[in-house]
Amino acid sequence: MSDGHRSGCPINLTLEVVGDKWSLLIIRDMMFGNRRHFRELLLNSEEGIASNILADRLKTLLAEGILTKAEDPTHKQKAIYSLTEKGIQLLPVLAQMASWGYRYLPVSAELGIRAQLLAEGGPKMWEAFMAELRETHLGVPRPRGAKGRGAGPSVGARLQAAYEKVVARRKKKA
């Protein structure tokens, strides 16, 4: 192809944007860990990303319109990263990848619990979680009666509670 891409295949083009070994992990940490500052992403990465790699991937994700960057209103010297709708639409991809990994690879109990719950919840749960992400990252209010708006805990809160429960159980055994 003359536009610098290997081919016009949608899978190839997607991999050219998020197919490196860090981009989807950064997006995962923003979605599931609500990590929105450079330092949070750097210091709380399960995989231990290097600062130069994080900076490079954030730059790419910004250029591709998957993230936005703004001055943090609570701290003028910090930037806050937000997912765009394009970034939020990657949730089903991450959920499917996590489900596949949970099914076929030796995942840890604490890091596998979210994958298990997302697989069990399916697209209905993903849509509810995407609505929560839109509220957090885009300022779009969730519909009345949605999970976390008077109808029980949010999907994000349920995923976090399940994770913390598994971590606590493992600590008791240790």
Language-model-detected regions and their locations in the chain:
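Short, contiguous, well-ordered secondary-structure segments
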Residues: 1-5, 14, 29, 65-71, ...
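N-terminal leader segment of winged-helix/HTH proteins
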Residues: 1-18, 160-174
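Short histidine
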Residues: 5, 22-27, 37-38, 129-133, ...
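N-terminal helix-turn-helix DNA-binding core of bacterial DNA-binding proteins
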Residues: 9-50
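Basic, amphipathic "hinge/linker" alpha-helix immediately C-terminal to the N-terminal HTH DNA-binding motif
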Residues: 19, 73-97
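Extended, folded domain segments that form the structural surfaces/walls around functional sites
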Residues: 35-43, 86, 90, 99-103, ...
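Canonical helix-turn-helix DNA-binding module
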Residues: 46-76
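C-terminal regulatory/oligomerization modules of transcriptional regulators
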Residues: 95, 99-174
